[in-house]
Amino acid sequence: MGEKPDKYEILQDLMRRRGFAWGSFEIYGGSRGFYDYGPLGATIKRKIERKIREAFQREGFFELETPDITPEKVFIASGHVEKFVDPLVECKKCGARFRADHLVEEALGIDTEGMSAEHLTQLIREHDIRCPECGGELSDVWYFNLMFETRIGPYGDQKGYLRPETAQGIFVNFRRLNAFARNKLPFGVFQIGKAYRNEISPRQGMLRLREFTQAEAEIFFNPNETEHPHFDEVKDEKLRLYPIEHQLKNLSMIELTAEEAVKKGYIMNTFFAYYMVMVKRVLLDIGIPEDKIRFRQQLPEERAHYSRDTWDAEIHSERFGWVECVGIANRGDYDLSRHMRESGADLTVLIHYDEPKIVKKLEVSLNMKRVGPKLKKDAKRINELIKGWGEEKKRELVELLEKEGKVTIEGYELEKDDFIIREVEEKITGEKIVPHVLEPSFGIDRPFYLLLENSLVIEEDRTYLRIKKDMAPIEVAVLPLVAKEPLKSIAYDIFRTLQKEGFIAVYDEKDTVGRRYMRYDEIGTPYCVTVDNQTPEDGTVTIRDRDTREQIRVKIEELPKKLRELIFES
């Protein structure tokens, strides 16, 4: 027996040769982390985006489109300027730069997730880890911000960044989106577009890009209402889970229904579980095999700075193992609270009660007769400031006065008797809350590559893509048996009819029909329609199945209906 063929290399060759995808800027030597989609690849990519868009729209989500370039202050508020970093190290001899955590992982075979720059530097020194390019000594580790920086306008005085995620464009529009949703939670907003990350050393082909496409939904909900109203529709769906405790104990993944996973405490609530099922169903609809999908819960040190809990939908790759393709994160109120604080905008939602409630509230104000001589012209301003404080801050003030007997406000030391404090009852009909956010975030490029990898079939006499039929970049090829009349004219008329019926179709008369079958099998075309010598006699053609190679005969007038059944309804 010969060596097992290298599936990765075969797929890379097929992708380049047949027009799916290849590295960008080839004629100038290329640039790592950038890929171009060819005619066939771009079609599949659009189909993936369409499947995700349709899934979001079925949930009643609204679509938004916002700029790729974003002013710096947005990312200061979101935490990306401070937190969106990777550890970097430089060779003192040749100047090459590398991800420090990757170098340490490869050299020592350990997990470096969550390690500080100081800890990584210590390991590099202790184990004498050298530059993989020239063997030179490495510098201390420092943090490198992954956002692409730019300048907005001709004067260069406004710094901006290419967005590292599409989400912030949604958060900064929350006031308008909430008004559009009529102030009613929950509601979802999604965006499909480009994101950019200046990866230090992008590797693994299409799996780590500097420019990539995301489809992110931000689902705004009341944190006091975490039961999804339609959970019963998905509660029996099975999910393959790899929770934190199983990772820490080196246990295998488990398979539970969505309902069991919530009851056992693996998934925090039915709201979260519902959207995990939605993500799984989208991946299945794209054509990822069910046994290649799992959900892995991120360890606390892995989570993004905004995340309270994250589960990654991972797809298995023969070459790369389990690959993160979708993140489902509970972002809490992190983003809206940060943008409220930095912008001063009110990003709350008024929640109306079913019935009015009587609540006890603190009223705190200054005793103006006592403090007037002390505060003089500042007395009125400070009094209004205190009266405008929230309930929590007022209670903190009272506790401090009880404990210390005095406080300092705006540089003035004030005693307990300087305040008028009383508890009152108030009837309220609702309350303002900062909504929490659940975010299903799809990458598009990784599922694209893994769909092709998991569709590639290598047989003795052919290599072909057994891609899900409605995901094929060319849905039907129309072939005259030989390039002679009247077969050519009949075949071309059928081709034009199928185009008008909405099929992605091609007409091909070059080479033997056997070679043409192989050509279209290779790129995943599910059906070839052949016009043969019987066609002029009885008005029938053959439909050849890519996977089985079997053929059936149908009448030309029935062809669009039959193909629609085979491709989109089977």
From Swiss-Prot:
It is an enzyme of class 6 (ligase). The keyword Lyase does not apply. Its EC number is 6.1.1.14. One of its GO terms (molecular function) is ATP binding. The keyword ATP-binding applies. GO terms for cellular component: cytoplasm. Substrate binds at residues 99, 165, 212-216, 439-443. It comes from Thermococcus kodakarensis (strain ATCC BAA-918 / JCM 12380 / KOD1) (Pyrococcus kodakaraensis (strain KOD1)). This is Glycine--tRNA ligase. ATP binds at residues 197-199, 207-212, 324-325, 443-446. Keywords: Aminoacyl-tRNA synthetase, ATP-binding, Cytoplasm, Ligase, Nucleotide-binding, Protein biosynthesis. Belongs to the class-II aminoacyl-tRNA synthetase family. Its main location: cytoplasm. One of its GO terms (biological process) is glycyl-tRNA aminoacylation. It is found in: Cytoplasm. The gene is glyS. Catalyzes the attachment of glycine to tRNA(Gly). PANTHER family: GLYCINE--TRNA LIGASE (PTHR10745:SF0), GLYCYL-TRNA SYNTHETASE/DNA POLYMERASE SUBUNIT GAMMA-2 (PTHR10745). It catalyses: tRNA(Gly) + glycine + ATP = glycyl-tRNA(Gly) + AMP + diphosphate. Pfam families: HGTP_anticodon (PF03129), tRNA-synt_2b (PF00587).
